[in-house]
Amino acid sequence: MNITEFEQHVVEQRAVAAGHYDAEYFTGAWRDAGNNYNLETRRQIEGKNPALIKEVFQPTKVLDLGCGPGALMHLLHELGVDVDGIDFAQSSKELATPEVRDRIAVGYVGDATLKPDAAYDVVVCREVLEHLTVLQVKQTVANMARMTSKYIYVTTRFHPSPASLLDFTTQFDVDPSHITLLNKDMLRLMFVLEGCRSRPDLEAKMDWGHKGRVLVLEKA
């Protein structure tokens, strides 16, 4: 993809509406067995992720950006971690457990008015960016860099075989709202341009499943 093609594709992208992420999206029969968003299913899927977040980052205060119904928030809460969440969908708050429901703010993940600067020592953003347009990804990256005082931990789906830095694709066979799979280097570049530096040592610790979908950045 050259710059002209990139520009055209970016202009043509359309954002997914918040209403798409309703109860059917999170818990409906369309999901593969064992992949819905009820707490006990997510507990099995998360495995050691919550404990690793606490161990690797040793956080005082965590923000789960694009938290969905708050399953990771609940699991971190069980470990004694102080955690807030932001999600685009009202259904996320409605489906959350009582322990974390009131800690979820409903709003756009790129909205710079929802939380103060440097309010969290870790901003977590997992399996969110693929649901955004390229322009929304750029805004959300900037917002993460603004809200963190130290670390950003991201997982997302990346382009499986990009021919250039600018290449991005979709993944509608997995989820109809997977509209942006970037080149991994492009996403890293966006964070670097926001004043963050890569932490490959921490990426190796967090990518215990060896899926190649983890980025860890530290605010410079």
Predicted regions and their residues:
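Glycine/Thr-rich phosphate-binding loops of Rossmann-like dinucleotide-binding domains
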Residues: T133, P162
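Short glycine/proline- and charge-enriched loop/turn segments
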Residues: L166-V174
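C-terminal lobe and adjacent flexible extensions of AdoMet/dcAdoMet transferase-like proteins
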Residues: E218-A220
